[in-house]
């Protein structure tokens, strides 16, 4: 039987020297099982790690949101805008510290009561603490009810007003004066300060009656500085810089001895109106005396215009407004000569009150001298002439002409010799220009060369002569006469 079974070949034992020089490439392909598993799950490992990190962040955000909801409302109102995570953590830490201090204080009270010692505070103080704690609990419950059922948010104006009112009422009974100072910024704009003042008044009276004042009564601090000095000080709360500092300093220095000062505040002109110009000095040339030309002009203007200083200043003002002010005075409430309302007529002075010889030097580039004498001034007049209208007596017109001549002499000293002609020429000019109703009885009245006594500016215009119309129009000075 044994012969029919083939015998297995005997295993040949290999020694170490048989392996030398052989290359076993298949051995390099073999890897350990642990490293093979790590390589295969390398891509699948990142996904669970991301999920774990997301879950961790979600848990952190959820805890911060719960802390935000558990924070008291007065801590939430200390910040503006959205509460960040860091702000929520800071407020939570602050609240925990306050609770820890309160817990430690209550623990000390309990120990003191167990040892049989007297209370650290007076009975009134203990009652106030109990009342304050109950008030906070009730206020918190009210806010939670409004937030849940009425959908109120802490940022709504009505919720802020309610919180301020509750806080103001609670601060009236606070035990320490340090917490009383928090009432001012929170209860501004409500009726809490007046209520606090009314509640503190009887408290101060009771403290004055007793020898030992109460701890929750705070005396009112009053300013000892006078109200006038307070009004004169610069207001540093305003940043406009328009408090009238330059005007207030001289008044304050003058009023220190008398005990009163007046503040002058700079004001803007109303609307778009420009401020009124400053008046010129009336005694610039005459020195206030009637000896010089300026003094004579001032006396003549004062005699003419009476109590109207503005018209007198306009007469003596040596600028471009002099001529425009001399063209027409009257016609209204400021008429120099009071007349009845029915007979009131405008009193006009001529525009060209200079003699032709003096005016020709100024208007020579625009008008010819002959044209000037022909159309603007009669040839016989060598002095300023008055213009008379019905309703104005001759003495008044003569006084007005004298005032105009004096004003012109004061404004233009170089022309004083021209404006003061000899008496015979002045008499001839007056006889030439005076109408028959006001002329002297013995003086002859010659016919006016142009036939118009009330309009010295208008001359005869020929319909077919364009040159005469160009010369007699003083509004076109650019056209020269041939």
Curated annotation (Swiss-Prot):
GO terms for cellular component: chromatin; nucleus. InterPro entries: bHLH_dom (IPR011598), HES_HEY (IPR050370), HLH_DNA-bd_sf (IPR036638), Orange_dom (IPR003650). Residues 44-99 form the bHLH domain. One of its GO terms (biological process) is negative regulation of DNA-templated transcription. Residues 285-297 have a biased composition (Gly residues). One of its GO terms (molecular function) is MRF binding. Residues 131-166 form the Orange domain. Highly expressed in skeletal muscle and brain, moderately expressed in pancreas and heart, weakly expressed in placenta, lung, liver and kidney. Pfam families: Hairy_orange, HLH. Residues 228-298, 438-482 are annotated as: Disordered. The keyword Transcription applies. There is a cross-link at residues 31, 121, 210, 266 (Glycyl lysine isopeptide (Lys-Gly) (interchain with G-Cter in SUMO2)). It is found in: Nucleus. Homodimer. Heterodimer with BHLHE40/DEC1. Interacts with CIART and BMAL1. Interacts with RXRA. Interacts with NR0B2 and HNF1A. Transcriptional repressor involved in the regulation of the circadian rhythm by negatively regulating the activity of the clock genes and clock-controlled genes. Acts as the negative limb of a novel autoregulatory feedback loop (DEC loop) which differs from the one formed by the PER and CRY transcriptional repressors (PER/CRY loop). Both these loops are interlocked as it represses the expression of PER1 and in turn is repressed by PER1/2 and CRY1/2. PANTHER family: BASIC HELIX-LOOP-HELIX TRANSCRIPTION FACTOR, HES-RELATED. This is Class E basic helix-loop-helix protein 41. The lineage of its organism: Eukaryota, Metazoa, Chordata, Craniata, Vertebrata.
């Amino acid at each position: 039987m044994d012969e029919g079974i083939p015998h297995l070949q005997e295993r040949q034992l290999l020694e170490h020297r048989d392996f030398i020089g052989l290359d076993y490439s298949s051995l390099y392909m073999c890897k350990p099982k642990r490293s093979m598993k790590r390589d295969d799950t390398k891509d699948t490992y990142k996904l669970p790690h991301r999920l774990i990190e997301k879950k961790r962040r979600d848990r952190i955000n959820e805890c911060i949101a719960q802390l935000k909801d558990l924070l008291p409302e007065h801590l939430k109102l200390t910040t503006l805008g959205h509460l960040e995570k860091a702000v929520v953590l800071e407020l939570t830490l602050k609240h925990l510290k306050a609770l820890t201090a309160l817990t430690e204080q209550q623990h000390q009270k309990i120990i003191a009561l167990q040892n049989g010692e007297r209370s650290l505070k007076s009975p009134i103080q203990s009652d106030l603490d109990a009342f304050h704690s109950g008030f906070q609990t009730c206020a918190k419950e009210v806010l939670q009810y409004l937030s849940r059922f009425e959908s109120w948010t802490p940022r709504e104006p009505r919720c802020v007003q309610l919180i301020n009112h509750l806080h103001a009422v609670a601060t009236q009974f606070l035990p320490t004066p340090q917490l009383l100072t928090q009432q001012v910024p929170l209860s501004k704009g409500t009726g809490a300060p007046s209520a606090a003042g009314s509640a503190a008044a009887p408290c101060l009276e009771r403290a004055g009656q007793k020898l030992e004042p109460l701890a929750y009564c705070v005396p009112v601090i009053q300013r000892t500085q006078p109200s006038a000095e307070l009004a004169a000080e610069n207001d540093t709360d305003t940043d406009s810089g328009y408090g009238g500092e330059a005007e207030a300093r001289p008044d304050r220095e003058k009023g220190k001895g008398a005990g009163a000062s007046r503040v002058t505040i700079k004001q803007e002109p109303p609307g778009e109106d420009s401020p009124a110009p400053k008046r010129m000095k009336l005694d610039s040339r005459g020195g206030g005396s009637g000896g010089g030309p300026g003094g004579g002009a001032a006396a003549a203007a004062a005699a003419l215009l009476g109590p109207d200083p503005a018209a007198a200043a306009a007469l003596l003002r040596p600028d471009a407004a002099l001529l425009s002010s001399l063209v027409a005075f009257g016609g209204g409430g400021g008429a120099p000569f009071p007349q009845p309302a029915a007979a009131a007529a405008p009193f006009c002075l001529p525009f060209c009150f200079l003699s032709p010889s003096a005016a020709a030097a100024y208007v020579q580039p625009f008008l010819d001298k002959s044209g000037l004498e022909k159309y603007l001034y009669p040839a016989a007049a060598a002095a300023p002439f008055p213009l008379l209208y019905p309703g104005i007596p001759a003495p008044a017109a003569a006084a007005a002409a004298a005032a105009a001549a004096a004003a012109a002499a004061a404004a233009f000293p170089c022309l004083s010799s021209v404006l003061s002609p000899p008496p015979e020429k002045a008499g001839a000019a007056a006889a030439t220009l005076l109408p028959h109703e006001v002329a002297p009885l013995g003086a002859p009245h010659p016919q006016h060369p142009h036939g118009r006594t009330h309009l010295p500016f208008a001359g005869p215009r020929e319909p077919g002569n364009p040159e005469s119309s160009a010369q007699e129009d003083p509004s076109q000075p650019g056209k020269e006469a041939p």
